[in-house]
């Protein structure tokens, strides 16, 4: 019976492993477990023997795997610290993370199933970080863990305890940026691969976690969590210390190949020592660096990874283009961040100009913005216009009340023309001697406008069509509720502010007049269903425009 495979129902049974396309590594591929670190004492050696035996059970998927794990845990559970230190030491001593990754997850699941009210699962955070997130991992090991989590969370989307454990460190106030960024980048890689594979459960899981995080962003730091953070910082420090700088390598090479005077050798040693001190200071400074981790920080970093993977490095895939159909909430969040961070001419954060990567602003303006505009106008909003009318109070509150409908109207009317013309005017007024610079700015802005204008036209068309289609819906409670929400959002003050901005332009603003006139006309007819006065009230606003066009005059005379 000992050699029988696990029956269905066991955590990570052979059947489940096959469903996840995960096969345990053959024993022949494992490192020898008999060779342990000299620092390991005799007691640990015995414990390692037990874990070796359990690991072999896991490899063969024996029926008694779960019982043996629980037996070993119960023997050590009087002292949780001892159990998890043994487990961590076992993994790091063998230094074979890929082979042990699924083993660790199996132990996690089995303990959670049997001791979720007794076991402090914070202990697993450090171990999971070591075997999956730590940036010392090779490409093969990292891809293996990313693939596992992508499939695991898709299969177990409603069991989010492991997901919460992975992200729990982000909630700790004043944690170092290195740890935060490593975790977010790891999650971004999981999301990107999941989209490519058509695995969407994790997207909803991520959306729910981010919205919850926005309402409860910090966790009180305990002595245990503080110890775990220090251990992870030490892991990051050790990784950095193992990387030799080019300067150090050159000096060592010189020392070995050349026979030089004693004084010169001493000088070089001093240089190496000084550089080592500099490296240590840089590492310490980086680990002590604190970032304001909020919903925007997390969402923007995740968005940038997805944009880079699916719009920049590779051609946009059908899965990414059709994302709202498969993950509406997550797509709504991404759309809000795209608009507020990159596209909005008035409200965008512009943080990409001063972010830690110091990316070229031209890359954003001429690559990211056109491609995200294309994504929204050609796919997401055209195929799923409901994104415009999603009124999720919890999400709106979390995102500082960003309203997609208002933002899209603003973009479709103004786009980059505001920044382009205002910048030109400011440049001309502030520095008449910089004609060459102004000409360059004009040329760049002109190229940018030519690049995005087709997408703005499409966006405007999508917006008008979406509002019109709402008016054509049958007169029922659901469509009337949408219209009521639209009317509450697009109140007269909103349109008056837009008209005032158009009137304040000191350049040809007829294109803006045409756009606002068309939007007000369609909007007024749509909202007339719930309030007949809307038509006249909003059409009358067009009289406040200081420039009239054929379109605005026609609408006013109807």
UniProtKB/Swiss-Prot annotation:
Residues 239-266, 424-447 are annotated as: Disordered. This is Putative uncharacterized protein DDB_G0287623. Residues 47-78 form a coiled coil. Residues 424-444 have a biased composition (Low complexity). It comes from the Eukaryota. Residues 245-266 have a biased composition (Basic and acidic residues). Keywords: Coiled coil.
């Amino acid at each position: 019976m000992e050699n029988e495979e696990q029956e269905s129902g066991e955590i990570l049974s052979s059947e489940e492993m096959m469903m996840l396309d995960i096969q345990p590594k053959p024993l022949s591929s494992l490192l020898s477990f008999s060779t342990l670190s000299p620092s390991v004492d005799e007691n640990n050696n015995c414990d390692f023997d037990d874990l070796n035996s359990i690991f072999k059970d896991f490899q063969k998927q024996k029926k008694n795997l779960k019982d043996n794990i629980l037996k070993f845990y119960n023997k050590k559970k009087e002292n949780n610290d001892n159990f998890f230190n043994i487990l961590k030491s076992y993994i790091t001593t063998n230094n074979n993370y890929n082979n042990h990754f699924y083993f660790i997850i199996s132990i996690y699941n089995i303990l959670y199933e049997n001791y979720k009210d007794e076991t402090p699962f914070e202990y697993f955070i450090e171990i999971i970080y070591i075997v999956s997130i730590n940036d010392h991992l090779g490409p093969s090991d990292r891809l293996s863990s990313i693939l596992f989590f992508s499939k695991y969370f898709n299969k177990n989307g409603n069991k989010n305890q492991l997901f919460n454990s992975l992200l729990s460190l982000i909630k700790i106030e004043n944690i170092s940026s290195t740890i935060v960024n490593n975790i977010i980048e790891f999650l971004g890689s999981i999301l990107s691969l999941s989209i490519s594979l058509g695995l969407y459960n994790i997207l909803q899981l991520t959306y729910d976690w981010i919205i919850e995080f926005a309402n409860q962003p910090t966790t009180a730091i305990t002595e245990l969590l503080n110890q775990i953070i220090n251990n992870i910082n030490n892991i990051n420090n050790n990784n950095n210390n193992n990387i030799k700088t080019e300067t150090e390598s050159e000096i060592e090479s010189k020392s070995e190949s050349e026979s030089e005077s004693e004084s010169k050798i001493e000088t070089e040693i001093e240089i190496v020592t000084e550089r080592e001190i500099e490296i240590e200071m840089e590492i310490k400074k980086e680990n002590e660096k604190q970032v304001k981790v909020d919903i925007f920080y997390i969402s923007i970093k995740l968005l940038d990874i997805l944009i880079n993977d699916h719009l920049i490095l590779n051609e946009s895939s059908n899965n990414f283009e059709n994302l709202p159909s498969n993950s509406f909430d997550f797509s709504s969040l991404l759309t809000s961040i795209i608009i507020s961070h990159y596209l909005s001419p008035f409200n965008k954060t512009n943080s990409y100009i001063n972010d830690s990567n110091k990316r070229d602003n031209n890359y954003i303006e001429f690559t990211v913005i056109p491609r995200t505009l294309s994504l929204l106008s050609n796919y997401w909003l055209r195929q799923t216009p409901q994104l415009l009318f999603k009124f999720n109070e919890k999400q709106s509150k979390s995102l500082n009340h960003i309203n997609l409908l208002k933002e899209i109207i603003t973009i479709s009317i103004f786009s980059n023309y505001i920044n382009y013309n205002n910048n030109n005017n400011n440049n001309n007024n502030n520095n008449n001697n910089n004609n060459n610079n102004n000409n360059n700015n004009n040329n760049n802005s002109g190229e940018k406008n030519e690049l995005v204008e087709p997408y703005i036209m499409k966006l405007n068309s999508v917006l008008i069509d979406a509002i019109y289609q709402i008016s054509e819906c049958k007169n029922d409670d659901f469509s009337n509720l949408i219209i009521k929400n639209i009317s509450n959002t697009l109140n007269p003050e909103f349109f008056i502010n837009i008209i005032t901005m158009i009137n304040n332009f000191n350049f040809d603003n007829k294109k803006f007049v045409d756009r606002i006139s068309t939007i007000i006309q369609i909007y007024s007819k749509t909202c007339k269903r719930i309030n007949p006065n809307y038509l006249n009230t909003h059409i009358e606003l067009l009289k406040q425009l200081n420039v009239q066009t054929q379109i605005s005059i026609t609408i006013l005379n109807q």
